[in-house]
Amino acid sequence: MKVAIIMGRGIEGCGVTKFTVEQTKWLANNGHEFVVYSSKDKSWTRKNSHDVSNVVQLKFAKPEEMNKMITGANEADVIIINSLPSIGHPEACIEQYKRFLNEITKPVVLIQHDHSKLSIRRNAAIEESVKRANVLFGHSKTNDFAKYVESVTGEAGLGSFLDEDTNGKSIIGFQPGIDFDAIRAKYWKPIEETDVDMHKWIGRTTSWKGYKQMFKFHNEYLRSAGAITTFEGIEKSPAYLAFREISEFNGHISEDIANISLQKNQPAYVFGPYINDELMERISKVGFGYQLSLLDTRFIERSIEYTHCELACAGVIPVFRKHYGERCTHRYYNKKLIDCDNTGTVWLDDENMQPAFDLVYKLSKDPVMRNEYREMAFEFFKLHQDSQYTFAEMMKHIEENI
């Protein structure tokens, strides 16, 4: 099958970009042809985070460049829209994208990565895209996107697809796949080469990523135990004004982490956006990696973030929010993550962080136990969200519904 992939928002360097990178790897490894088109009408802070050398970047606002995308998309068997232009894109870009929707002739798949209605409202031409799509994917069949689809199409947005002649549209849940084995082969270090005193949080300057909880854990538990905590991914966005009021920290957002001397018994060190490949190399050398995101149950279903997966792939001990484990269902075991055995994960409870610290401390003193834990985490999350399962499942749904 030949697939045309559209990144209407452009290369924003976050989840959708990572999804596209992993998606195209899976397509290539499984005998599919693909071409990726991305808008370059708007520039993003993290645009250099990933290698996107295989992406055709176009000015959507220019009709002659949009013509190239329309022609290329119509030469494919299916068109997958990974993201839409934002309402902040130039008006000409949005209008040309709408022309694209009207002039393409092949089946359309729309993958909506946003969770909440606030994020969904930032998408331009979303109603036109939903109505044009033959297949719709979302992180959850009960999230705000499902409600939006119901409001647009008059259907419930749940369950199996209805018969074609009813024009009913429902949401199919998806998980963003990643090639666990390939990432492990590139970054995983012997346990002797990991530094148990180093603790690394990765995320963005948005509150649901859990930076408040990381500050608390460092200030009240890790710092006095001789740990060094680094944050990576913090931008000086409007949300940074609130971020900097939460706790004291060593701010180095515009500096290279390699040039900073990290010392014990210090406030956490805070660094800015990263190049993914360089970050993964740094992660692979620390003892504990923190992904402390938390979303409401209706947004999650089975989906974990790419940064959850990357920690498990890199060979560190993953520390995740306990409440996330209580809300997310394992793809294979069909149980909440927290209720599964041998997760290899430290679950951090917002209300009582002592048990997580006790386990972190115990692991830091026992390299054999630590190695067993990270191996368990790798296998557990690979079975949950490896691309060999998730993208195969997605493609099966696409083939059955176009």
Predicted regions and their residues:
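A short, active-site helix/loop in glycosyltransferases that binds the activated sugar's phosphate group
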Residues: S119-S170, I178
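Nucleotide-sugar-dependent
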Residues: Y290-E310, V319-Y332
